[in-house]
């Protein structure tokens, strides 16, 4: 826990927590807040390293005021800081799905139609509001 408290200080010093992802791509696109869960991102970073191909993150942390979150009755997985959307398609999408299931990600959303192709990953615990494990399509 102490280590994770040092993350903002490390960022100020130009030291990044993750091998494959920048702080900028993980912050809220609405307000630039840094709310991503470090333990969650360590899992994503490890997955990226194992697969060996780029994971362009289109959405990570979203503050409660983010337009997508503000439309919801209760904040979604992104507002918890434990979700990312990864732009991926074709055989890489297939490889990512297999690896994410093996790595223990509990929420997997798939959008592979038209120009919007991404896979949502989260690791939320099972709850009445959000049953996990769960897979859905957009």
Where on the chain are the PLM-derived regions?
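Solvent-exposed, flexible loop/coil residues
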Residues: 25, 65, 70, 74, ...
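Single-pass alpha-helical membrane anchors
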Residues: 1-14
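Flexible, active-site-adjacent loop/turn segments at secondary-structure boundaries
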Residues: 19, 24, 59, 64, ...
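Extended, low-complexity, intrinsically disordered C-terminal regulatory tails
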Residues: 44-71
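Catalytic cores and adjacent binding grooves of peptidoglycan-active enzymes
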Residues: 75, 79-84, 88-138
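Active-site acidic/histidine clusters and adjacent loop/turn architecture
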Residues: 12-54
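N-terminal start-of-chain detector that recognizes signal peptides
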Residues: 30, 55-61, 91-95
């Amino acid at each position: 826990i102490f280590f994770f408290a040092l993350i903002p200080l490390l960022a100020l010093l130009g030291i990044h927590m993750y091998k494959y992802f920048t702080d900028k791509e993980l912050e809220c696109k609405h307000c630039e807040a840094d709310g991503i869960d470090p333990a969650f991102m360590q899992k994503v970073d490890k997955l990226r390293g194992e697969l060996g191909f780029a994971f362009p993150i289109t959405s990570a942390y979203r503050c409660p005021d983010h337009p997508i979150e503000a439309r919801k009755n209760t904040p979604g997985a992104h507002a918890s800081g434990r979700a990312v959307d990864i732009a991926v398609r074709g055989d890489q999408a297939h490889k990512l799905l297999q690896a994410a299931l093996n790595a223990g990600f509990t929420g997997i959303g798939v959008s592979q139609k038209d120009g919007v192709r991404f896979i949502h990953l989260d690791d939320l615990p099972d709850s009445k509001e959000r049953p996990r494990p769960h897979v859905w399509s957009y």
